[in-house]
Amino acid sequence: MRPARSIRRLGVAVLSVFSLLAYPVAGQAAGPDPVLLIHGWRADASAWDVMGQRFAALDGRTVVALTLPGNDNVVNGQYIRDQVAALGWSRLDIVGVSMGALSARYYVKSLNGAAIVDAYVSLGGPQYGIMSACFLPQSQGGQMCTYSSFLKALNTGDDTPGAVRYMTLWGGSDTTVPQSSTKLDGGACYVTVPKVVHTAYEEDVAVFNAVVRAVDGGTTWCPGTIK
């Protein structure tokens, strides 16, 4: 876990010994769903500093970024479930980047998160795996392997259960996760943002704008194609 950084500079409130970063906003009464941000492989909550601050500038928006316990998506999904319960949220939107999109989808699909999640957004998520992860231990990122038992189970049955708005976004310059692997089968919004590399999803403004449309809903929530 990264050492403490300048909290004043980040403008965040730090809870639970850096396991959670909350980006405070003025007037958090009635308003949009809270947004939960899930980081990628070997990262932590601070990966969302830029997007978190952008969300914090929107009216009435509660935004929380978690630091996951490790790189096992099953354990991470359970941790997400427990943190949502601890936060007392009855509705939320969830955004995951890279491997974090798998941890988030495990929570949505396998742990009944679909009952309270309004929008699920995947940024460069390897939904159907990447070969480069096949060299990693299962609990250290190997679950992202195309042939992992985790992905086989996760992708069995309906990819997009419930009344959730599903968006999968891919950066046109992402050479880590192929576009074909980022898509979900049935009822998802597919978006490509040109010239975005795999490490830039959390900071790119066009990606942020697409995420906002997805979590806000409405008739124009999908800036891409729904299939």
Model regions: which residues?
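Short, surface-exposed "cap/lid" segments of acyl-processing enzymes
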Residues: 30-65
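N-terminal secretory signal peptides that target proteins for export/translocation
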Residues: 1-6
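Short, well-ordered alpha-helices that flank and scaffold nucleotide-derived cofactor binding pockets
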Residues: 53, 57, 109-110, 213
